[in-house]
Amino acid sequence: MSILLYFIALLSLIIIKKIKDSNRNLPPSPLKLPVIGNLYQLRGLFHKCLHDLSKKHGPVLLLRLGFLDMVVISSTEAAEEALKVHDLECCTRPITNVTSKLWRDGQDIGLAPYGESLRELRKLSFLKFFSTTKVRSFRYIREEENDLMVKKLKEAALKKSSVDLSQTLFGLVGSIIFRSAFGQRFDEGNHVNAEKIEDLMFEVQKLGALSNSDLFPGGLGWFVDFVSGHNKKLHKVFVEVDTLLNHIIDDHLKNSIEEITHDRPDIIDSLLDMIRKQEQGDSFKLTIDNLKGIIQDIYLAGVDTSAITMIWAMAELVKNPRVMKKVQDEIRTCIGIKQNEKIEEDDVDKLQYLKLVVKETLRLHPAAPLLLPRETMSQIKIQGYNIPSKTILLVNVWSIGRDPKHWKNPEEFNPERFIDCPIDYKGNSFEMLPFGSGRRICPGIAFAIATVELGLLNLLYHFDWRLPEEDKDLDMEEAGDVTIIKKVPLKLVPVLHH
């Protein structure tokens, strides 16, 4: 009898809450279970689960994850309202257990709460690293690292052996960013090497964005994280990341300005110099934690997005021979035979179809399928629904880029769709948002595009590509969490063109 009364009381509470929610004009929501909310519906890849739920319940969707309210936006129109009309009201970030620990309570650019500190950090990072002038100044690094990659691929081509192009492209982008941002090669530091950094990136990815402590505040969430080993793992990864960052900064502190090599002064030298010259009365003071946060943002975000974009582009080209032939014909016709076979960044400007291939890849395979979460700072209205203050907003750009309302045959890889099409990836067109929009748009767009375009140009100019004989078809299955990579590494056989 008591159990029956308990369930009647519980059912009554659910009905009362549902009536209250309907009176508040909240977005539609799938059936929620007590305590866990909608967690039971989120199996598999997170962005695809949200895509499927949005198709069923609408492009503005309210989910309850434990005790956490989250609104998922999956349409162009809703995204424009959130990121343009209400940009200021929802441009802060939620603080989670993982981001609080790994990013030192938001001392970086990507995950910092909105305020003066964020504005100053974005201004500094743009001035010292992301401006058009700065990006151009790093072109020789991009060209040199691509030449090294081509040299290694030629050795594999002569042996007629396959290469792990996923690993190759992560290595390429990692080397470019490490030299550009930190002024040294992987092999120049005693404490820094490509394998160690790749392992750390993988560990950070595995931790995910949310923990049980975020979903179930109080003792329950903490206890589950403690028993599962999540807290211990989080602390271990933080110590490893922090130790690596300390080594990178110490390497710069040991070198005086007179000893700086041709790759320097880099962003770390510049920011360390600013820290030394700060005065007591300055309204904003740059800290070592800010410096560490900027380093993490540049490397972790920069390597993932650029490498993943090139991997998906090459996979789609191999899967679509018509597009592969068209882009290679353009490249080889426009560039011709190069002296010493060295590609220069100026060559990219001639290649309009290559640029369309990059656009189409960013539409179909945004490296981060969900924009970093925002949090509302006041109540706003999206598509007629009330979104309360302190609600997490997730924009599903993977879903938006495949919306049949705005894209004909959205699952098809067709770069021609962008001919005479004003839609771009710079945050002004809400039909595709691979880098976000508004005050929290990714500051590294110019650097990423320069890296991707030159990398693809080198791969497509010097080599033809085919699947290894043992592979009959290309597996395009996705994997990942914050960023989405091919589940099966991209292994191809390079064939020398000349």
UniProtKB/Swiss-Prot annotation:
GO cellular component entries: membrane
The protein's enzyme class: oxidoreductase
Gene3D superfamilies: Cytochrome P450 (1.10.630.10)
Topology in the lipid bilayer: Single-pass membrane protein
Source taxon at top rank: Eukaryota
Principal location listed in the UniProt entry: membrane
Keywords: Heme, Iron, Membrane, Metal-binding, Monooxygenase, Oxidoreductase, Transmembrane, Transmembrane helix
Protein name in the entry: Cytochrome P450 71B24
Organism: Arabidopsis thaliana (Mouse-ear cress)
Gene (name only): CYP71B24
